[in-house]
UniProtKB/Swiss-Prot annotation:
Belongs to the SmpB family. It comes from the Bacteria. Coiled coil: none annotated. This is SsrA-binding protein. CDD domains: SmpB. GO terms for cellular component: cytosol. The gene is smpB. PANTHER family: SSRA-BINDING PROTEIN, TMRNA-BINDING COMPONENT OF TRANS-TRANSLATION TAGGING COMPLEX. Required for rescue of stalled ribosomes mediated by trans-translation. Binds to transfer-messenger RNA (tmRNA), required for stable association of tmRNA with ribosomes. tmRNA and SmpB together mimic tRNA shape, replacing the anticodon stem-loop with SmpB. tmRNA is encoded by the ssrA gene; the 2 termini fold to resemble tRNA(Ala) and it encodes a 'tag peptide', a short internal open reading frame. During trans-translation Ala-aminoacylated tmRNA acts like a tRNA, entering the A-site of stalled ribosomes, displacing the stalled mRNA. InterPro entries: SmpB, SsrA-bd_prot, SsrA-bd_prot_CS. Keywords: Cytoplasm, RNA-binding.
């Protein structure tokens, strides 16, 4: 999480597996009352989420926030599109990055900082299947090295 301490609510582990993250930035979310209550209960899924920029504004798509259990007829739509709060310079930079190169914007983490729900978004480039296999092999080798060093030091 960037600067400051916040309570981590959800993490998109699949994003780091499917994409190589180039850059990250923090954005606020425009939410309804029942949505923030569900987020505080960790009822959010970032797995298929992505960010699209339209008319100079950033929107979060395909992020599932479960309906609030104590909500009534005013409960929210779980998959609705949510606006992200970013500075104009940040939005224009994201827009140029996504138009020129083959990168996309994915949500990485959702956390609450100072009472506000924040999302950490990342500029991501898709990995090929051989890159994914290579990363898994590298992690496995690192784990084995750590294990042998731990046993050797005893």
């Amino acid at each position: 999480m960037p600067k400051g301490d916040g309570k981590l609510i959800a993490q998109n582990k699949k994003a780091r597996h499917d994409y190589s993250i180039i850059d990250t930035m923090e954005a606020g979310m425009v939410l309804q009352g029942t949505e923030i209550k569900s987020i505080r209960n960790s009822r959010i899924n970032l797995k298929d989420g992505f960010v699209r920029i339209r008319n100079g504004e950033a929107f979060l798509h395909n992020v599932h926030i479960s309906p609030y259990e104590q909500g009534n007829i005013f409960n929210h739509d779980p998959l609705r599109t949510r606006k992200l709060l970013l500075h104009k310079k940040q939005i224009s930079r994201l827009e140029t990055e996504t138009k020129n190169t083959g990168v996309t914007i994915v949500p990485l983490k959702v956390y609450i900082r100072d009472g506000y729900a924040k999302v950490l978004i990342g500029l991501a480039k898709g990995k090929k299947s051989y890159d994914k296999r290579e990363d898994l092999k590298r992690k496995d080798v690192d784990r084995q090295i750590d294990r042998t060093l731990k046993n050797f030091s005893r």
